[in-house]
Amino acid sequence: MSYRQTLEFLLYQWLDAEALKERERFSDHTRETFDAVLDTCERIARDKYAPFNRIIDIEEPRFDGEKVILPRATYEAQKAFAASGMLSAAQDYEVGGMQLPYTVEAAANSFFAMASVSIGSGLLTSGNANLLMVHGTPLQKEVFAKNEFSGRFSGTMCLSEPQAGSSLSDIVTRAVPDGDDFEAEPLGPRYRLQGNNTMLSSGDHQPTEKIIHPWPAKQRQTAALERVVVLAALRITLKK
């Protein structure tokens, strides 16, 4: 049994994903649209992702002292992934999404993980943008999240500090108000961050214009609020 056959069995026979089209949000979809998404992702994974496994052995990423140099195949794969619409597949039509059931989106994205997990960082961007869509301001959604969904920007994980791990109450990074007018910033209060963070996947690269880092930090106000954790969105512009 091929991977596609296994995936279709799990999706349609076990999870009964077709039944989701009876819900109002997914009423525009059919088995045919679900299959079309699977077809597209399977093709991109085969043509753009799978060859990367050999290429990366020959053209290893490197740091030239100023920037990270990646194989050209990295750019081509990420461009194809963004063009497919999978970064925003489950989002509302109004923000450029397909209103695809997340079950189908996750199944389709598994083709990329199977083909080359080392290049499959698009899920980090989607997760980053999803966080902003839930907790961000309207302007933050417009400036950050929508540009991530389009592939113009990329995003990283919301990671902790080397000594803290998952114990967020132990982080030591502080968010210090940046000037007396720090709350006047249209995109949200502006802070200076003091501390360290663990940058992991997609932390520095060239394929996108900006990288959005969600950075947890404590906001020093009063002793009673010392344990309050805020989340700052950092925009990093990369030199081409």
Model region roles, listed by residue range:
Residues 61, 124-125, 136-189:
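Internal maturation/activation junctions in enzymes
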Residues 189-240:
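A short core secondary-structure module
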Residues 12, 90, 109, 158-160, ...:
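Residues in well-ordered beta-strands of folded domains
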Residues 39, 76, 82-86, 149-153, ...:
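Short, well-ordered loop/turn elements at secondary-structure boundaries
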Residues 1-119, 139, 143:
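Amphipathic, small/basic residue-rich leader segments at the start of a protein or domain
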Residues 16-17, 114, 133-138, 150, ...:
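Short, well-ordered loop/turn and helix-capping segments at boundaries between secondary-structure elements
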Residues 104-107, 136-137, 171-174, 207-209:
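Short secondary-structure boundary/capping segments
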Residues 91, 96-99, 103-106, 112-130, ...:
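FAD-binding core of FAD-dependent oxidoreductases
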